[in-house]
Amino acid sequence: MRKSKLVKRHNKKIFKVVKKRDDETIASKSKKELNTDLSFEGEKYFKNIKQITFGGDNAEAYWSFDDKQLVFQSNHNKWGVECDQMFLMDNDESFESITPKMLSTGKGRTTCSYFMPDNKHILYASTHEANELCPETPLRVDGNYVWPIYDTYDIYVADLDGNIVSKLTNQIGYDAEATVSPN
């Protein structure tokens, strides 16, 4: 199983655990008092796990084919974004005090990035051509995240400097969640 799938599954587990704690509980306890261990009792597959993002909703993280970089989506407002955008990190980075490199346009909402086999390009879905503003976000139900489905997503290929080099779709519909075969 590729690391990217393990990262994605682990992110969902962490996301659910974090969302069960309310901000008041977190603010009233020191870091030592909080359970900062990122593994779960009985976990036998994850080792040496470290937190790499601090704040915002971070998801859809995937490793490059050479395992040197990770691409992920985030809406962390401290990074100057209002809705999900694509970010890049090297495998030894952490973003507690610095902003990662943005690969998407910074306009519209983006989702579902994935490395191309050359490790020099990614693909991702974005609504930026239909509207440069963030589309309306669905209301959370009982505090839970609701996945937005927009018919204005199209799929793009960009280089690691954030330049779009091609557009792969051009029709109304939910064009997102693409993946790439390594060959």
Cite the ranges covered by each PLM segment.
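Polybasic, low-complexity, intrinsically disordered segments
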Residues: 1-19
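Blade/loop signatures of beta-propeller domains
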Residues: 24-47, 153
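Multi-bladed beta-propeller domains
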Residues: 36-57, 89-109, 158-174
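A flexible loop/linker signature enriched in serine peptidases of the S9 family
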Residues: 54-57, 73-86, 104-110, 125-154, ...
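Catalytic phosphate/metal-binding cores of nucleic-acid and nucleotide-processing enzymes, i.e., regions
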Residues: 63-65, 85-86
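Residue-level detector of Asp-centered blade-edge/turn motifs that repeat once per structural unit
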Residues: 65-66, 117-118, 182-183
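Hydrophobic beta-strand positions that form the internal "hydrophobic ladder"
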Residues: 70-71, 122
